[in-house]
Amino acid sequence: MKRSGGPAAPQFPKIREGEICITWIGHASFLLQTHEVNVLIDPIWSKWLKVIKRLKQPGFEIHHLPSIDFVLVTHAHFDHLDRRTLRRVAADQPIVVPMGVGNLVHDLGFRIVHELDYWQTVQLGPLKISLTPCHHWGARFLADLHRDFGGFVIASNGRTIFHCGDTAYFPGFKEIGERFNIEVALLPIGAYEAPTGREVHMNPEEAVTAFLELRAKTLIPMHYGTFRLGFEPLHEPPQRLLASARVHGIEENVLVMTEGRPVVL
């Protein structure tokens, strides 16, 4: 499977009422657009995570972003909460984070910081944003174990997108699927051969199981191929995902995106 990303300016389409446009920037970073608002999730344009080099460039340059209405950050890890990037996109708009993460973003230029507890919902314009639990960890440094972590359900005009954040497989996917009518699930599929040996990331087969338990309609994989966070080959996660999807008869439900290429659903 050949995937390509590059710095060319994306051709963002005109979005009609009822449509949603999804652009994968790379790793866990996404731009979600409706006909009313633009939402940025876990944005990171940095070339380094401390000592870990970015191996694939973002799908487009940060200055090609449209005006951003809301920003969501799933947890405090450096590959999801990048203060340098957040400072560049902050323009006095609201940002939503889990409980305990607000002090990492309050000084970056956001108008208001919404800290959510699990299952809590905030209304931002036409969007309902809900924080869901996951099986991961939230510390940015060794001592700050108080920080929560999770995924976001974004609902607007009958369309519902679930950005899972980082997680291992856990039984909670079934409850998330029961609470929300999820249409599109953005699920992590990389870093499952982690150097630490900790089970905090799903492998591709577990992502398929999670998708089935969520009862979603479309699976978009993420969190692979950008940073070397595990020992698995960079090309392996989507191949294993599609193989597992074929076994379960859901290959047509999997959308492997190309960085920087908008898709309208």
Please name every model-derived segment.
Residues P43-S46, H75-A76, C134-H136, G165-T167, ...:
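Active-site metal-binding loops of divalent metal-dependent hydrolases
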Residues E19-C21, V89-I95, R159-I161:
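Short active-site oxyanion
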Residues L49, L81, V105, A139, ...:
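Glycine/Thr-rich phosphate-binding loops of Rossmann-like dinucleotide-binding domains
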Residues K2-E17, I25, L31-A76, R83-R88, ...:
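Pre-active-site segment of Zn-dependent metallo-hydrolases
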Residues K2-E17, V97-R159, Q239-L265:
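Metallo-beta-lactamase
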Residues F70, P94-L104, F170-T258:
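Cap/insert and terminal regions of metallo-dependent hydrolase folds
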